[in-house]
Amino acid sequence: MFLGGTFARCGLIGCLCVGCSLQGAKPVAPTPPAAFDKAPPNASANWPSQDWYHGFASAELDALIAAAASSNLDLEMARARVAQADARARQAHAGILPSVDAGGNANYLAGHSVNGSAHETDWAALLSASYEVDFWGKNRATANSARYLAVASRADRDTLALTTLAGVANDYFQVLSLRERLAVARSNVEAARNLLEIVDSRFKVGLSNPVEVATQRAALASAELVIPELEQSQEEAVASLAVLLGRPPEDFKVAGTPLESLNEPQVAAGLPSDLLRRRPDVFTAEANLESASSSLVAARAALFPSLTLTASGGVQNPALNAAVISLSGVGPTLNLGAALAQPIFDGGRLRAARAEAQAKQQEMAASYRAAIVAALVDVENSLSAIQHLDAAREFQNESMEQSERAFEGARLRYKQGAGDFLSVLEAQRTVYAVRDQFIQYRLARLQALVSLCKALGGGWQAPDAAAQPQAAALQAAPRPEF
C-alpha cells in the first residue's frame, strides 16, 4: 500500500511537471520609453477619441467617414473574415466537450412455417457518447489557439477600419487642396496673360523686344500646362475617395470647402506604455503570439498518451421470437469502455509538427516586437512632422506676403517703364510657387494631424485595457458565441 501510494504520488507530480513544461517560456516584449522624444513639453495626455475626425469641424467629412464605415468593401470582407474566425473557434471549442450520437432502426419481419404464418416488428434505439480526457491540455490549447485567432481577426478588422477612415480624411483633404491649387494655377495663367498684354503693348511702341514677347508667351504656355496635370490629379483623388466609400467614381461628387475653414484639432500623445493598449495592430500581434503559444502546447501534448472514454446504451424490442434474437440480447443494454493510445512510430510527424509550432511561436514573437517598435516610430514620425510644420508656419506666412508684394511692385514698375522684364517674370514665378507651396503646407499640416490620430490608435482601446495589462485584456476579450 505504501509503495503503491508513493508511485501514484510520484506519477501525479511527474504529470504536473510535464504539464507545466508544455507551456514553455513566454517571449519578453521590448520595454517602451518613458516618453515620446518629439512630444511637446507640458502637453496634455488626452488621447484621441473614437470620433477624432469631428475635430476638423467638417460636416461633409463626417458624412463621408460614416459612409465609408458602413459601405467600404474591404471592411465588409474583414467582417466576413471575423465571422469565419468565430466559426473556426466554435469548431475548436467543440473538441473539449463530449460527443453524443443517437440512432435507431426498425424492421418488419414476416414468414411461413408448419405452424402457419407469423410476423414481427423489430426496433432498436441506441445512444452513444465519447469523451477524450484532456489530461495534457491539448484540446483546451487548440480551442484557445482558435479563440485568440478570432480575437486577432477582430483587431485586424479594427486596424483596417482605422486605416480606411484615415484614408478618407487624407483623400478628402487632398481633393480640397487640388481644387485650391487649380484656382491658383488658373490665377497664374490670368496673371501671365495680363503680363503678356503689357509686353505686347510695350513692344508695339518700341519699348520692348521680341525676346521678351517670346519669353512671356513661353511662360504663359508653361502656366497653362500645369492645369491639365492638376485636373487629372484631382480626378484621381476623387476616384480614390469614392473607392474608399465603396462607390463607383462616375457619379461621386465632393462639395468641398476651403482648407482654411477647417479646424486643426489639438492632438496630444500620452505615455508610450499606454500606446500598446491603444493600437489594434499591436493587439493583433499579441493575440497571434498567444495563439501560436497555445498551438505549441497542443503540439507538445500530442506526443503524450490520449485517453478516450466511451459509453453506449440502447433498448431493443423484447417481443422477438428466440429464432431472430441476436447475440446482443433484448431489452436495455449498456456498454462502457476506455481506450488508451500512445504514439510510438509515425515517421517523426508529431515531432516535426512540434518543431513547426515552435518556429511559428518564434515568428509571432518577433512580429509582436516589430509591431511595438513600428507603433512607437509612427507616433514619433507624426510628432516630428507636426513639430517641423509648426516651425515653418511663420516662414510660410512671411513668404506669401512678401512674394505677392514683390510681384505687384515689379509688375507696376515694368508697366511704367521703370523696371526690367526679367524681374517681373521672376517675381511672377516666385509668387505662383509660394502660393502653391502654401496650399501644400496646409495639406501637409492636416494630413500630419490625421497621421498622429491614426498612430495613436484613433480612440481604439483593448478590452478592459484601463484596468488590466494587455495580456490580461486578451484573456478578457470578447469570445465567439458557442
Predicted regions and their residues:
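Sec-dependent signal peptide recognition
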Residues: 4-13
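Acidic, low-complexity, intrinsically disordered peripheral segments
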Residues: 9, 21, 263, 416, ...
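C-terminal motif of bacterial Sec signal peptides marking the signal peptidase cleavage site
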Residues: 17-19
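Small/polar, glycine/serine/threonine/aspartate-rich low-complexity segments that form flexible
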Residues: 47-56, 105-128, 142, 251-268, ...
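Membrane-embedded beta-strand positions in outer-membrane beta-barrel channels/transporters
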Residues: 65, 124-128, 172, 217, ...
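Sec/SRP-type N-terminal targeting helices
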Residues: 76-77, 93-94, 133-161, 211, ...
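Periplasmic alpha-helical coiled-coil/stalk elements that build and connect Gram-negative outer-membrane
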Residues: 139, 155-271, 385, 389, ...
